[in-house]
Amino acid sequence: VLSAADKTNVKGVFSKIGGHADDYGAETLERMFIAYPQTKTYFPHFDLQHGSAQIKAHGKKVAAALVEAVNHIDDIAGALSKLSDLHAQKLRVDPVNFKFLGHCFLVVVAIHHPSALTPEVHASLDKFLCAVGAVLTAKYR
């Protein structure tokens, strides 16, 4: 459960990300494909080269979902309900991949905003990303 301080910290980080969210989403995917190559199996039709249009487009979707979750931080489940349905019922993505994606997003934020990622903010952002992952896998059961 995200505390009031967690919510403030997460919103603060996303305010710093601002207009870079789409780029960070693509960078997160690229990092995930390199660090966790098994995740590529869900994207057999993608050009997985650095900077590909497909990675940029999907990175934009990832970023939009995270921004949507931040904008509805008190109802992440409601905000991401359709996305949860899609991943559970149609795409059938292994739930562990959301943890991988969250970890890679944390790394991207740390690279671009090292001073913003204090231990407290890091913990809050990690809790938020875990909450998003939990929502996206909730309908697997």
Swiss-Prot record:
Function recorded in the entry: Involved in oxygen transport from the lung to the various peripheral tissues.
SUPFAM superfamilies: Globin-like (SSF46458)
The name this protein goes by in its record: Hemoglobin subunit alpha-A
Domain named Globin: residues: 1-141
Gene3D superfamilies xrefs: Globins
GO MF annotation terms: haptoglobin binding; heme binding; iron ion binding; organic acid binding; oxygen binding; oxygen carrier activity; peroxidase activity
GO CC terms: blood microparticle; haptoglobin-hemoglobin complex; hemoglobin complex
InterPro entries: Globin (IPR000971), Globin-like_sf (IPR009050), Globin/Proto (IPR012292), Hemoglobin_a-typ (IPR002338), Hemoglobin_oxygen_transport (IPR050056), Hemoglobin_pi (IPR002339)
